[in-house]
Design a protein with these regions (language model features):
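Feature marks short, surface-exposed loop/turn motifs that line or immediately flank catalytic pockets
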Residues: 46, 104, 138-140
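A short, structured loop/turn motif at beta-sheet edges
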Residues: 86-94, 122-128
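A solvent-exposed, acidic/Ser-Thr-rich amphipathic alpha-helical stretch
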Residues: 16-23, 36-92, 99, 111-113
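Short beta-strand edge/turn micro-motifs at domain boundaries
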Residues: 2, 115-143
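Generic short beta-strand segments
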Residues: 97-104
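Short, low-complexity N-terminal intrinsically disordered segments enriched in polar/charged residues
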Residues: 1-45, 143
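A short, polar/proline- and glycine-enriched secondary-structure boundary/capping micro-motif
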Residues: 106-109, 141-143
Length: 143
């Protein structure tokens, strides 16, 4: 009789979970100060950011995009989100799913039709967690 077993992966540590949560908090803080350089600093050198109609690759491109966005469409805004799911892909990879969105001036909650779901793909490089890819999409299909 042959038995097949699923590969086992050691459970992630609390410090890994905290480090990944810290990535999201660094993004929120960078957004609060409209600091495009700090925003881009959470990404790997070749990290990607996909927003509706937008694709940016690399820290420099992400920083340039966010610099313009903070002076344009995102001027005066904040961003918020809450985790929905966190899964580890071995010891050095994780996927975080969040629900959130952009808060316009005066808003304390994301408008229902503006809410997004986001996927954060994190990788551990030399013992430190980085954002390799970020993508968001509207929570509801717009008619």
């Amino acid at each position: 009789m042959t038995t097949t077993s699923e590969p086992t992966v050691a459970a992630p540590t609390d410090s890994d979970r905290i480090a990944i949560a810290a990535l999201t908090q660094r993004v929120v803080a960078a957004w609060a100060y409209h600091d495009a350089k700090a925003f881009a600093s959470v990404f790997t050198e070749d990290g990607t950011m996909i927003l509706p109609g937008v694709f940016q690759q690399g820290k420099a491109a992400i920083e340039a995009y966010m610099t313009a966005a903070f002076q344009g469409d995102y001027q005066g805004t904040q961003v918020t989100g809450k985790p929905l799911d966190l899964r580890f892909l071995g010891h050095e990879g994780a996927v975080l799913i969040t629900l959130g969105g952009v808060l316009r001036p005066g808003e304390s909650e994301v408008a229902d039709d503006e809410a997004i779901r986001a996927t954060w793909t994190a990788v551990k490089v030399d013992g430190e967690w980085w954002l390799a890819a970020y993508q968001n999409t509207p929570r509801h299909k717009k008619s």
